[in-house]
């Protein structure tokens, strides 16, 4: 019997319209009610994923930022691996100079982008990052 179920969000758990289907919501609720542990494993920001989890009303671990952060079911930070400041500055400088690259930088509870693209808001149907 499975004890843990983990899933990505984009292209996996979320439908093509970037929303959780009623079936997905019900399945996640049933999994956690049966005592299985659910883990969100995604490249998204932890606040974004936390809103999705809270809207579902379930207890779930979160592995976010492509594995750079891990939060427990209460949202407490268990693990963080941040880029060295000099490396991050170098990467951001290279990417910032190219108009075709959009850079997303997460720092604790903050999210920075080098350019705002309104069309990217379609990815945030289940949670709104302020």
Regions found by a protein language model. Name each.
Residues 2-17, 91:
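Asp-based phosphoryl-transfer active-site loop
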Residues 21-23, 84-85:
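Charged helix-capping and loop-helix junction motifs
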Residues 51-58, 116-120:
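Glycine-rich loop at the start of a catalytic domain that most often binds anionic cofactors/ligands
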Residues 23-35, 90, 94:
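Catalytic-core regions built around general acid/base machinery
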Residues 68-130:
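HAD-like small-molecule phosphatases
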Residues 28-51, 66, 104-107:
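Substrate-recognition element of Asp-dependent hydrolases with the DxDx(T/V) motif
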